[in-house]
């Protein structure tokens, strides 16, 4: 098995939002993008606070990826659901094969009308990158930008290329090597 590891150079690059930053105090950013979320092919949320706030709008994400933490502190979001729930290991600063597989499988189920929630043991901070790669065009991926707002990524061919380039800049670590 293997995983992708964040490099110091890429960490700096990822400080910039991958999509459009919608600023404001909760719930303002979510109310501003509500119609866009309702029109999206799939809504993907990355993070506990983002998932919780999208659910409060009455929108159930096709795919939700969360780790029961916010700003490195334990957090118990109000995310009770009838979704298919998968649990994966994903250490901080990495994208594991298990996370990639869960996201890919999640979209397969979402395309058949199921809601899928991926509970990450570790950290889900980088999950937006593979979520964009596996999401069908016309989907929207949301993640939080702490103390600033929420980032909305419209999944397009250009956006997929950008995320593919980001993945290619990560260090590939073979587990057990």
UniProtKB/Swiss-Prot annotation:
GO biological process, one term: coenzyme A biosynthetic process
Group of enzyme by EC: transferase
Superkingdom of this protein's organism: Archaea
Residues that hold GTP according to the record: 48-50, 67, 69, 124, 147
GO molecular function, one term: GTP binding
A Pfam family the protein falls into: DUF359
Catalytic activities: 3'-dephospho-CoA + GTP = GDP + CoA + H(+)
Cysteine pairings via disulfide bonds: none
This protein's pathway: Cofactor biosynthesis; coenzyme A biosynthesis
Enzyme Commission number(s): 2.7.1.237
Cross-referenced InterPro entries: deph_CoA_kin_Thcocales (IPR054930), GTP-dep_dephospho-CoA_kin (IPR007164)
The keyword Membrane is annotated on this UniProt entry: no
Keyword Nucleotide-binding among UniProt keywords: yes
Keyword terms of this UniProt record: Coenzyme A biosynthesis, GTP-binding, Kinase, Nucleotide-binding, Transferase
Family per similarity comment: Belongs to the GTP-dependent DPCK family.
HAMAP family in the record: Dephospho_CoA_kinase_GTP_dep
Function summary: Catalyzes the GTP-dependent phosphorylation of the 3'-hydroxyl group of dephosphocoenzyme A to form coenzyme A (CoA).
Protein name: GTP-dependent dephospho-CoA kinase
Organism: Thermococcus onnurineus (strain NA1)
